[in-house]
Amino acid sequence: WAEGIHKFFITDDNFARNKEWESIFDRLIELREKEKIPIGLLIQVDTLCHKIPNFISKAKRAGVTRVFIGLENINPDNLAVAKKRQNKITEYRKMLLAWKAQGIFIYAGYILGFPGDTPESIRRDIEIIQRELPLDLLEFNILTPLPGSEDHKILWNKLVDMAAALNKYRLEHFVRD
């Protein structure tokens, strides 16, 4: 911060499940409130973080101004394919409103290209999201069987044609038929 840097991205893929989240937030709160160090944070969390007592309110006091949440999808069948049974659209709104109540910018990720997706189902899901979910920014990514992932192994074993160039596996390229 002495060099003018006061915005940070904590690159824990799910800060809410970090066993030390509360002690980290407590120290950041102390730096902000007692030592008046202007810290702003972006963190990544899961869709159930709002159920952890005091997590969101402490996040605000610790300097969280933006939160990234991997919604993955709203279609229950797609969430099952992604093995994200904990992600439920019925919880999404409640969780998002808890962040909104603290004035925190919500940046979410959404995956397109599940086996059951069609242009019509994607349009319908986007309309539901626009109507029901209070998001500030929604980023769309293509379902990508990243090398080393379970999806990639399954497709490889089924001899599905996939891109040989590893630089194509960046969530924005189609890498299979």
Describe the function of each predicted region.
Residues 21-22, 52-53, 118-123, 152:
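Conserved strand-to-helix beginnings and helix N-cap segments that scaffold or border functional pockets
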Residues 1-107, 112-114:
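Conserved SAM/AdoMet-binding glycine-rich loop
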Residues 29-30, 63, 87-89, 94, ...:
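Alpha-helix boundary/interfacial micro-motifs
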Residues 120-177:
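C-terminal accessory regions of radical SAM enzymes
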